[in-house]
Each structure stands twice: as structure tokens, then as C-alpha cells.
């Protein structure tokens, strides 16, 4: 799964720690999501999409392999 979390975080001029704080998760969680090493829960994905004013589908794209 690919995502635009890093791009959208930069657009809002947020650090990983600031984004993590807004979402009540650790900075390491944000780092892992950005590096595609961790897929967020549905609840976290929805929170992120709302924060970035995107749909979940726009923020997270499933590889069609």
C-alpha cells in the first residue's frame, strides 16, 4: 500500500512529532507509516484523512499487483 502521508504532512508544515501528537500516536508510528512499514488501523487512517482533508482512498492507495 502506498500513501501520501509524508507529502501531506509537509504541506501542512508539521513534523512527525507534531502529527503524532495531533493523532495521539507515537512519532515512530508516523515514521513507520511514511516508510510503508506499518499499515494504520481503519480508525487511524480515517483520522489522518480528516486532518489532511482527503478521503482515505486518496491518502492510501492499494497496490494493484
What are these regions (language model features)?
Residues 25-38:
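Recognition helix of helix-turn-helix/homeodomain-like DNA-binding domains
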Residues 8, 42-43:
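Short, Lys/Arg-enriched C-terminal cap helix and immediately downstream tail that follows
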Residues 61:
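Phosphate-coordinating loops and pocket residues in cytosolic domains that bind phosphorylated ligands
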Residues 44-58:
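DNA major-groove recognition helix of helix-turn-helix/homeodomain DNA-binding modules
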Residues 18, 29, 58:
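Residues in the helix-turn-helix
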Residues 10, 38-39:
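Short amphipathic helical patch at the helix-1/turn junction of helix-turn-helix
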Residues 3-22:
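Short basic helix-loop element that most often maps to the first helix and adjoining turn
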Amino acid at each position: 500500500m502506498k500513501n501520501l502521508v509524508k507529502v501531506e504532512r509537509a504541506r501542512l508544515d508539521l513534523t512527525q512529532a507534531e502529527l503524532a501528537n495531533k493523532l495521539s500516536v507515537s512519532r515512530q508510528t508516523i515514521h513507520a507509516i511514511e516508510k510503508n512499514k506499518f499499515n494504520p488501523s481503519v480508525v487511524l487512517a480515517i483520522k489522518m484523512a480528516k486532518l489532511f482533508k482527503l478521503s482515505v482512498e486518496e491518502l492510501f492507495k492499494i497496490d494493484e499487483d
